[in-house]
UniProtKB/Swiss-Prot annotation:
Pfam families listed in its UniProt record: ADI
Keyword tags: Arginine metabolism, Cytoplasm, Hydrolase
Keyword Cytoplasm on entry: yes
Catalytic activity: L-arginine + H2O = L-citrulline + NH4(+)
Family: Belongs to the arginine deiminase family.
Location(s) in or outside the cell: Cytoplasm
Protein name, entry field: Arginine deiminase
Organism from which the protein derives: Chromobacterium violaceum (strain ATCC 12472 / DSM 30191 / JCM 1249 / CCUG 213 / NBRC 12614 / NCIMB 9131 / NCTC 9757 / MK)
GO molecular function: arginine deiminase activity
EC number of the protein: 3.5.3.6
GO biological process, one term: arginine catabolic process to ornithine
Amino acid sequence: MTKFGVHSECGKLRTVMVCRPGLAHKRLTPDNCHDLLFDDVIWVERAQKDHAYMVEQMRARGIEVIEVHDALAKVLDDKAARNWILDRKVKADNVGIGMLSDLRSWLNEMPSSQLADHLVGGIAKFELPFDPKGLFGGYLDRSDFVLPPIPNSLFQRDPSCWIYEGVTLNPMYWPARRQETLILQSIYQFHPYFAGKVNIWWGGCDTDHGPATLEGGDVMPIGNGVVLIGMGERTSPQAVVQVAKRVLHREGGAKRVIACQMPKSRAAMHLDTVFSFLDIDLLSVFPDVVDEITCTSMYAGDREGEIRFERHEGVKLVDVVREALNLKEIRVIQTGGDAYQREREQWDDGNNVVALDRRVVVAYDRNTYTNRLMREHGVEVIEIPASELGRGRGGGHCMTCPIIRDEVKV
């Protein structure tokens, strides 16, 4: 039986989830891209080529890569699983009453691979093989979406995240992204690779979590039973404490959760946009933000469900991490260049690298200063083109959801 679990940020990566660019990105226009959380439209064919190159580099190192469209198509082959997804995706609240029956009948009979493409890529009114009835159907223009696309599925780090031997199914901050969690939940629940083998710590699409929001770019299981969770633009303290209660001192969970309070800005939307592990004792950081982070540690209390808090007033994140990992020293590589270049490279995901192993990372090619500094510190930097993939504001760390990763012995 496969043992899923992520035990560090930089140990050997063995299995990872990704989502290639596709139909959802062909739907992006200058008019709608900001609503869909992209800064610009992208050249989809080039983005697909660049994403495939990243996947090729991972597979060349023996990493098992699971692709969302393919996994979802496999799930949709099962009638019960298809019904489970469509019951939650195609509802009167989403598509109105008038077209509900006709739309559901059409999707029930659609080939699995085509349906997977549309569940991620959306459906426009002009694609319907029937004349949509009802007020909503008449309200829509020809190119309006019946089911909106979810192009941020490219960034698989966020809708679910593994914390040691369990996973959270994340209630995401922006409405444009909330359907991503449904896709991941269906894969973990019904795909034969995962079904019956996944320990879910918290979350799921059947509960309205209100302001308790969590995104995986803020979550880092760093080893020694410690997990960092950023609290900035996307992840709320209401969610962090609930997750802490579920993982602390549970079998396969964590012994310490460190909440990292960040400024709320799009440039630093997640912890992994300003802070990443290159090795257990080597970090890439954007100091302008990281030095302002305030940390609070959470531990299991004496009674069931009780949490003990320890606020680290005046102690920098890097020092909190060093102590939590029982390290004598942590070396820090700051985002490279002068003040202007440093800010540009952080914006272009210079710190958002994903480790394939200790001191082996995937990074965007455009961050030349930061990449050079990493190489000078003995890190192998595998560069991938940034011109198209980076338009959604996410790098290698954002585009990957580790499912099996080794621990690093301290």
